[in-house]
Amino acid sequence: MTTSPPHVVLIPTFLTEAEGDELLARINTAADFRQNYIQLYGRKAIPRLEAWCGTWDYPYSKGVVLEARSIPDYLQALIARIAAAGFGTYNGVLINCYRDGSDYISPHSDDDYGDPEPTIPSLTLGAARPFRLARKASGSKIDKSTKFEYIPQHGDLLVMKGLTNAEWKHWIPKTKKPVAERINLTFRCKKV
């Protein structure tokens, strides 16, 4: 593994354990998780559950569009807390549920709406899973010699800033180890 990407910040215990537990319980009760599908040599399930709360329909990944749903008060409060910490304001929250080790997300960049240097906070709840980054190489490939790994814990906030998404890809790999559910909230901003 290489040195950490220069524009990534990990804030341990952004939420206390009790705050994280309460938020996790609310999300598991209230979030409208869906199993989405992409067209890739037929119809293929995206290997995680997803929910979207935002002021616009969220298009991504080979024709998948998550419909706009209002942001609940408890997430509005979290957005305000992130803003108060100096990480920007947001009008959308993508919630991914990794049910076990077979759920994952492939290497990708969050190239949000033409902003070459977006700030994208990401909050982990539940089980810790490796969050890997590697520099982009030609085409859709990554430079494996530049791989770096964080392991955000319950309540940790990881923030990608600057050129992180222009120069790096990130992912949550599969694992055969037994792991509990991990919920990840990724905060987005779009001028609407």
List each model region and its residues.
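Non-heme Fe(II) oxygenase metal-center motifs and adjacent flexible, charged/small-residue loops
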Residues: 1-192
